[in-house]
């Protein structure tokens, strides 16, 4: 997987953001999913900033989709920093785009 999006040292992670509420749900919206070859599947999860350990369950994308909510498996508070992580399963290449809220 191309990790050029990563803005940190953690494998397959980037796009750090802080929570602006105490709600234990993160949201991901996949607005672009263009397959260039093969049958890639992109699994995404939210991790505490500075690690790739799952703070939410992972969700696997195979195309565009409306907002998906991922529940945290730990207590969260406003101001805590998290980052989006991803891993590719299946062979091929895809271009993805979207947005997320911790």
Q: Model-derived features: where do they sit?
A:
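Post-signal peptide N-terminal regions of Sec-secreted extracellular proteins
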Residues: 1-102
């Amino acid at each position: 997987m191309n990790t050029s999006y990563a803005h940190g040292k953690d494998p397959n992670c980037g796009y750090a953001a802080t929570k602006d509420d105490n709600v234990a749900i993160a949201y991901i919206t996949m607005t672009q999913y263009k397959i260039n070859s093969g049958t890639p599947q992109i699994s995404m999860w939210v991790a505490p900033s500075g690690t790739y350990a799952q703070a939410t369950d992972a969700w696997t994308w195979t195309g565009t989709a409306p907002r998906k909510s991922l529940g945290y498996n730990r207590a969260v508070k406003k101001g805590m920093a998290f980052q989006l992580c991803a891993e590719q399963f299946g062979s091929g290449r895809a271009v993805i785009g979207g947005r997320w809220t911790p």
